[in-house]
Swiss-Prot record:
<dbReference type="Pfam" id="PF00104">
    <property type="entry name" value="Hormone_recep"/>
</dbReference>
<dbReference type="GO" id="GO:0071385">
    <property type="term" value="P:cellular response to glucocorticoid stimulus"/>
</dbReference>
<dbReference type="GO" id="GO:0008270">
    <property type="term" value="F:zinc ion binding"/>
</dbReference>
<keyword id="KW-0805">Transcription regulation</keyword>
<keyword id="KW-1017">Isopeptide bond</keyword>
<feature type="modified residue" description="Phosphoserine">
    <location>
        <position position="203"/>
    </location>
</feature>
<dbReference type="Pfam" id="PF02155">
    <property type="entry name" value="GCR"/>
</dbReference>
<dbReference type="InterPro" id="IPR050200">
    <property type="entry name" value="Nuclear_hormone_rcpt_NR3"/>
</dbReference>
<feature type="compositionally biased region" description="Basic and acidic residues">
    <location>
        <begin position="152"/>
        <end position="163"/>
    </location>
</feature>
<dbReference type="GO" id="GO:0004879">
    <property type="term" value="F:nuclear receptor activity"/>
</dbReference>
<keyword id="KW-0479">Metal-binding</keyword>
<dbReference type="InterPro" id="IPR035500">
    <property type="entry name" value="NHR-like_dom_sf"/>
</dbReference>
<feature type="modified residue" description="Omega-N-methylarginine">
    <location>
        <position position="23"/>
    </location>
</feature>
<feature type="modified residue" description="Phosphoserine">
    <location>
        <position position="226"/>
    </location>
</feature>
<feature type="compositionally biased region" description="Low complexity">
    <location>
        <begin position="141"/>
        <end position="150"/>
    </location>
</feature>
<feature type="region of interest" description="Modulating">
    <location>
        <begin position="1"/>
        <end position="420"/>
    </location>
</feature>
<keyword id="KW-0832">Ubl conjugation</keyword>
Length: 777
């Protein structure tokens, strides 16, 4: 071979560095190096260049030495030393090695021929590099150093070889002695030139096979730990990526107060509060808002500021943020240096970075008193369930030393409970119409009475009347008003009594010396409690329309069919009316059905007589507003005899001038006028109910006449009319049964009326009906 000087390339032709993307790849220090031992170096910083092992061809990899990490002293040419030690002719930088491409050896297969090689220049250059990079100029430049260590003689054995034997070795993978001399130990898969360097005991290399440069975080350039070098070594964590985030323990920085009131913070002045996030392993340490997890550690990072009232006063609460795990979602750990600070999990204060130390000390001196006893009392939080506030009270009522004035609401609660309406249970506004009711029920009752509305319940006359559902059923609401005792006469009586009292007061003031003058009280007062008659007024059915077409010529068949259809609807209304009568539903169900079957014709005929008496003075038969039987229609075949019986009822009502209250009581007694011969299942209750309405009829007579000598006479006349109704109804039923059984007449009957007639015919034919009469014939 030629002289060694011819192998040295120009200094200006050294290639530039390429940033590595992966760790643990085989590296070639210079592109002019085409053979020799291939060295694998674990990446120590992102500035190392690493070659990929994806193909079989050897790739070029360059190492860059930053200016900040190497001294300005002239160093021996490393390329020259490597070239001379390997015995390769490199020539110029563009010179190519002739022959086939060199095979890229796999890991663990590199071997060299035994011998000795002079590596003094390489050792001197690497030693100089070690001395220059052992003490970096600053922490940041030391972290970005390209190569910070070199292999020792113990790890890199000295061998003698020439170019031909070296190339033959790379192709055949055997040495000249026929054996495989391995460059690494058995437990190594790569050749580590930094193995013998000493590292601190806290190095992460303890968990990475004694190599501190195999951490995944050192590959990314943004993950450098250079800002934490030197004085920030206490921030380094020991562990691997599988460990949980551990809280950072820092020296106690609890503020203390001197005797003169000055604040002394024990935290070192050189400890700064970085705003950027710093990654170590798989964890991030930063200051960020979150939910407090109470831990008793003396670190000062951020200040708790609560919106609204100043809950902890103007004092600072020392809270430290430890770590955020980015693997499983955000998870915050905080420390609080005050033992008296209690925080619930659902409270989320907003954290702000504390101001600089001078401002913090000024706030402390301004808000905190002097004395050592104040060191531990930084304020107490008060949340729901907590009762103590030492500072920053949001209201005087929360302070134990400030007595709030007595509340008026406490005295109101000790008074009597609010009065409720007797109708709908709403809050009563006063006594209206003799009953304690609300304003809504007062107006409703007045309109119902003065408007003479005939309400009808769509249910069973037992609807619930309360504040919410009082408008659903006016019939049940009106009935409840009457049951409570509401009466329009109560207001008039109250006015009369008030006027009499005022007149009496004036007389007593004029003649105070006369003790004989006393308050005048009327002898009789109207009854303020609800009566059965008033309830009967409420439940009275409305007048129904027949739907008769008067434009079509009249006929007996057409009129009778229309009357039957109207009668069927009136029977349905009579059933609802009977169930609404007080006491009727207390009877047995079979008794109720029996009474309705026996009395349905009584009710129809008596109501027809009342309408005829009120509208036509007993001259016409007013079945419905659109169906009135006049004298002309009475002349139709089979009509006159039946109309004559019905006109008798209206004429008697007209002769006696029966009042509406008397009519209602008489109509109810007609419902109870016929029973089976064997009696009812609830006979005793039936007799009691019947006697009750007989008394009601007597009360109605007394209310109308007012003279006891005439009351008995009128009672006799009215009861005599009730007894005569049996004969009228018997004649009407005979004709009805005849038309029902005679199919040649083709008179239609509604379904319900046909069912009643079918059940009633056998009973009348067998004589199983007992008439309840007031007078003997």
């Amino acid at each position: 071979m030629d002289s060694k000087e011819s192998l040295t390339p120009g200094r200006e032709e050294n290639p530039s560095s390429v940033l590595a993307q992966e760790r643990g790849n085989v590296m070639d220090f210079y592109k002019t190096l085409r053979g020799g031992a291939t060295v694998k170096v674990s990446a120590s910083s992102p500035s190392l260049a690493v070659a990929s092992q994806s193909d079989s061809k050897q790739r070029r990899l360059l190492v860059d030495f930053p200016k900040g990490s190497v001294s300005n002293a002239q160093q021996p040419d490393l390329s020259k030393a490597v070239s001379l030690s390997m015995g390769l002719y490199m020539g110029e930088t563009e010179t190519k090695v002739m022959g086939n491409d060199l095979g890229f050896p796999q890991q663990g297969q590199i071997s060299l021929s035994s011998g000795e090689t002079d590596l003094k220049l390489l050792e001197e250059s690497i030693a100089n590099l070690n001395r220059s990079t052992s003490v970096p100029e600053n922490p940041k430049s030391s972290a970005s150093t390209a190569v910070s260590a070199a292999p020792t003689e113990k790890e890199f054995p000295k061998t003698h070889s020439d170019i031909s034997s070296e190339q033959q070795h790379l192709k055949g993978q055997t040495g000249t002695n026929g054996g495989n001399v391995k460059l690494y130990t058995t437990d190594q898969s790569t050749f580590d030139i930094l193995q013998d360097l000493e590292f601190s005991s806290g190095s992460p290399g303890k968990e990475t096979n004694e190599s501190p440069w195999r951490s995944d975080l050192l590959i990314d350039e943004n993950c450098l730990l250079s800002p934490l070098a030197g004085e920030d070594d206490s921030f380094l964590l020991e562990g691997n990526s599988n460990e949980d985030c551990k809280p950072l323990i820092l020296p106690d920085t609890k503020p203390k107060i001197k005797d003169n009131g000055d604040l002394v913070l024990s935290s070192p002045s050189n400890v700064t509060l970085p705003q950027v996030k710093t990654e170590k392993e798989d964890f991030i340490e930063l200051c960020t808002p979150g939910v407090i997890k109470q831990e008793k550690l003396g670190t000062v990072y951020c200040q708790a500021g609560f919106p609204g009232a100043n809950i902890i006063g103007n004092k600072m609460s020392a809270i430290s943020v430890h770590g955020v795990s980015t693997s499983g979602g955000q998870m915050y750990h905080y420390d609080m240096n005050t033992a008296s600070l209690s925080q619930q999990q659902d409270q989320k204060p907003i954290f702000n970075v504390i101001p600089p130390i001078p401002v913090g000390s000024e706030n402390w001196n301004r808000c905190q008193g002097s004395g050592d006893d104040n060191l531990t009392s930084l304020g107490t939080l008060n949340f729901p369930g907590r009762t103590v506030f030492s500072n920053g009270y949001s209201s005087p009522s929360m302070r134990p030393d400030v007595s709030s004035p007595p509340s008026s609401s406490s005295t109101a609660t000790t008074g009597p409970p609010p009065k409720l309406c007797l109708v709908c249970s709403d809050e009563a506004s006063g006594c209206h119409y003799g009953v304690l009711t609300c304003g809504s029920c007062k107006v409703f009752f007045k309109r119902a009475v003065e408007g003479q509305h005939n309400y009808l319940c769509a249910g069973r006359n037992d609807c619930i009347i309360d504040k919410i559902r009082r408008k659903n059923c006016p019939a049940c609401r009106y009935r409840k008003c009457l049951q409570a005792g509401m009466n329009l006469e109560a207001r008039k009586t109250k006015k009369k009594i008030k006027g009499i009292q005022q007149a009496t007061t004036g007389v007593s003031q004029e003649t105070p010396e006369n003790p004989a003058n006393k308050t005048i009280v009327p002898a009789t007062l109207p009854q303020l409690t609800p009566t059965l008659v008033s309830l009967l007024e409420v439940i009275e059915p409305e007048v129904l329309y027949a739907g008769y077409d008067s434009s079509v010529p009249d006929s007996t068949w057409r009129i009778m069919t229309t009357l039957n259809m109207l009668g069927g609807r009136q029977v349905i209304a009579a059933v609802k009316w009977a169930k609404a009568i007080p006491g009727f539903r207390n009877l047995h169900l079979d008794d109720q059905m029996t009474l309705l079957q026996y009395s349905w014709m009584f009710l129809m005929a008596f109501a027809l007589g009342w309408r005829s008496y009120r509208q036509s003075s007993a001259n016409l038969l007013c079945f419905a507003p659109d169906l009135i039987i006049n004298e002309q229609r009475m002349t139709l075949p089979c009509m006159y005899d039946q109309c004559k019986h019905m006109l008798y009822v209206s004429s008697e009502l007209h002769r006696l001038q029966v009042s509406y209250e008397e009519y209602l009581c008489m109509k109810t007694l007609l419902l109870l006028s016929s029973v089976p011969k064997d009696g009812l299942k609830s006979q005793e209750l039936f007799d009691e109910i019947r006697m009750t309405y007989i008394k009601e009829l007597g009360k109605a007579i007394v209310k109308r006449e007012g003279n006891s000598s005439q009351n008995w006479q009128r009672f006799y006349q009215l009861t005599k009319l009730l007894d005569s109704m049996h004969e009228v109804v018997e004649n009407l039923l005979n004709y009805c049964f005849q038309t029902f059984l005679d199919k040649t007449m083709s008179i239609e009957f509604p379904e319900m009326l046909a069912e009643i007639i079918t059940n009633q015919i056998p009973k009348y034919s067998n004589g199983n009906i007992k008439k309840l009469l007031f007078h003997q014939k």
